[in-house]
Curated annotation (Swiss-Prot):
It is a multi-pass membrane protein. The keyword Cell membrane applies. Its cofactor is Mg(2+). The chain crosses the membrane at residues 23-43, 46-66, 99-119, 141-161, 163-183, 213-233, 234-254, 268-288. This is 4-hydroxybenzoate octaprenyltransferase. GO terms for cellular component: plasma membrane. Belongs to the UbiA prenyltransferase family. One of its GO terms (molecular function) is 4-hydroxybenzoate polyprenyltransferase activity. It catalyses: all-trans-octaprenyl diphosphate + 4-hydroxybenzoate = 4-hydroxy-3-(all-trans-octaprenyl)benzoate + diphosphate. It is found in: Cell inner membrane.
Amino acid sequence: MEWSLTQNKLLAFHRLMRTDKPIGALLLLWPTLWALWVATPGVPQLWIMAVFVAGVWLMRAAGCVVNDYADRKFDGHVKRTANRPLPSGAVTEKEARALFVVLVLISFLLVLTLNTMTILLSIAALALAWVYPFMKRYTHLPQVVLGAAFGWSIPMAFAAVSESVPLSCWLMFLANILWAVAYDTQYAMVDRDDDVKIGIKSTAILFGQYDKLIIGILQIGVLALMAIIGELNGLGWGYYWSIVVAGALFVYQQKLIANREREACFKAFMNNNYVGLVLFLGLAMSYWHF
């Protein structure tokens, strides 16, 4: 019986950290890899790459824990989130806080193996991860904070590799914010009706009938910024082809969200994993020496 209870608790932690739903970690991973490849340039040192890949998964898990902790009194009123571990009682508030601390401590121990500049930047990463879940109560732009939180690995990656944060770094950071606002607005469109009822704020609510248009403008901005990064770093044809393919994926997403149907909007959100992957493959191809 004790083993059964322990197993159930571990499964609840697994769900709380969203390790069964890797999309969030992947959307955090791709910009991290973009930054590592541009900063190096090419293939980064194995240990630095390992630290960042592990850090992505750990901090995304920590972010999910604090997000559910912040939303624990709201999630029970939303159909999609009512059965999450905290509102369902599978995990207590004390356990969630302890799990968050453990995940952050492991992440920080990994960062301590890197240089001082990266360690200092990691403090801001923790602050962003903690603040984001609470922003949806106070502003209709929590997605901007999410973009900053998901993109903070970019200056950290540049700092870890070169101990500098050049113009390309900040252009990539801005591109990631625009991308995150676009894809998380698609995600928020799924819950828009429920969010209005319970008082949660989002860009999907703020943009209203102009949501599709603004998402499209943001996506164009992402492509333009990534093209500028390519020019600044002398990237090859493979990279620019990846931007074209990413643009085609954005067009596909626009078709999916055309009628604002929940399942289609969620499918559009999920499709952004391929955008990140394609852009990374383009970068890798540019630095590949045949």
